[in-house]
Regions:
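Non-catalytic alpha-helical scaffolds and adjoining flexible linkers that form interface surfaces
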Residues: 4-6, 13-276
Length: 276
């Protein structure tokens, strides 16, 4: 059964035969890897049950290794791992989905790299986040199949990831006075939400940080993207002007609240600008 944790005595090189180790069986997606020695890798894995972990996959770069496929970036596998002093160690792995089509297209690959970097940025080691894991798995699936436009997946994923991380944009009440209104005309990134017409007249209340004009239609699409399952994102036709507004606001929202510059996002921008 996925995610079942058992206690067992594990005999392996460097571990005492009498040392009790915790063995976990869990689904996971490789976010990134670093080569180690001649044939090993350190994997950063977003798991379903254990949160983000760093695990050593011994010999995984050898052509005949049983861990070869499961140690590649973006691959979804079932892992059996045990926890050592500094790292987890991969004992077994069974590949569930490689999302192979992502690797055949540079633009898809660029999106996936950014999605993985975002997930790594907001996840914590050994703190489970099944919602984040399932979100990433679904997004990689639809990115691979091409059933949902990449740009739509991009915006939808970012908003849902921020929601899971505790940064859901406030679209229902004025971020300054707290009143509900149909007259929201600005979105403040620093304040994390919309600003009503009355409060928008006093620039001193919201002048810090990025502030965007926002229409009622844009707010409604924001709500749709936040509240709709990834699999149904393409059920609503979105005006290009509104989509571009949301894309700009979402980007600023993420960079501000996560306080990080993502190299993979810069690379994605370069790929899109090149017309690839």
């Amino acid at each position: 059964m996925i995610g079942v944790t058992i206690k067992a005595r594990l005999r392996t090189s460097g571990i005492s035969g009498s040392e009790e180790m915790s063995i976990s069986k869990t689904e996971g997606i490789v976010l990134k890897h670093t080569n180690l020695g001649e044939a090993d890798r350190i994997l950063t894995i977003l798991t379903r049950n254990n949160g983000k972990i760093k695990a050593i996959a011994k010999g995984c770069r050898k052509p005949k290794s049983s861990l070869l496929s499961s140690s590649e970036v973006f691959v979804f596998s079932e892992f059996v791992v045990y926890k050592g002093a500094n790292f987890y160690h991969v004992s077994q792995a069974s590949t569930r989905e490689t999302f192979y089509n992502i690797r055949k297209d540079l633009l898809r690959l660029s999106y996936a790299t950014y999605f993985a970097e975002l997930a790594e940025s907001v996840s914590d080691e050994d703190i489970p986040s099944e919602r984040l894991f399932l979100l990433l798995a679904k997004v990689l699936y639809y990115l691979s199949t091409g059933e949902i436009p990449m740009g739509l997946l991009h915006v939808g994923y970012q908003l849902k990831l921020m929601d899971i991380s505790g940064y859901r944009p406030n679209l229902a009440k004025c971020a300054i006075c707290g009143k509900s209104s149909e007259d929201f005309i600005k979105f403040s990134v620093n304040l994390g939400g919309v600003i009503c017409g009355d409060c928008s007249t006093d620039e001193r209340l919201w002048k810090d940080g990025d502030v965007f004009k926002i229409s009622h239609g844009t707010i409604e699409v924001f709500k749709f993207l936040l509240n709709t399952e990834i699999s149904r994102l393409n059920t609503k036709k979105i005006d290009n002007t509104i989509f571009n507004e949301i894309d700009k606001i979402t980007r600023s929202f993420i960079l501000s609240h996560l306080d990080k510059r993502f190299k993979s996002l810069d690379f994605l921008d370069d790929i899109k600008d090149s017309g690839f």
